[in-house]
Amino acid sequence: PAKYAKAAKREINHQVYELIFKNSKIFDGKALFDADTHKNVLATGCEPSIEAVQALMLLLMQQTDPFGNAINVKPKNMILPLGYGFKAAQIFQSQTVNTPENTQAFNALYQYRNNIQIIEEGELNVLAGGAPVPWFVSADPKQVGSVKVDYLNGNKRPIFRRSEKTGYLGFFWDIYMDWVVSVKDW
């Protein structure tokens, strides 16, 4: 039974990242990541770099509510496929960076080293197969809505029911869990 409980948790994780990775349409009929309406995606795909991270963080911090008012969200998580964590550590933990003129310059992202949580998620690599793997910056879910997992009756653990049947040795198990993955906001 414990293996089934772990499998259910892995399936929830898979569904969350699948929704993000496949850029599903959300409640407004637009894709979750949409340059025109949501303004939450870079123009071209790239691996994490100081410039790309700064651009994505600015897009996040410039988000507005449906009435056009600034909502002042701060970046909290950097969600990366396996392998980009090394690059992220270099981006956030280096006080200085090399410039094209071969000099040292202050790394503006160094100040965020204690505020941004790096999340390396292998599910992104699996979903991408051999294709390029996207990465994401998100706000604190306590500050704004994001991807949410809701559970039937708030029960976050699988329900186990054991039964016996006359004439059979051993037990029969019913193991079930109900959840839904949804997007509250972009």
Residue positions per predicted region:
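Alpha-helical scaffold segments that mediate packing/assembly in large oligomeric complexes
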Residues: 1-63
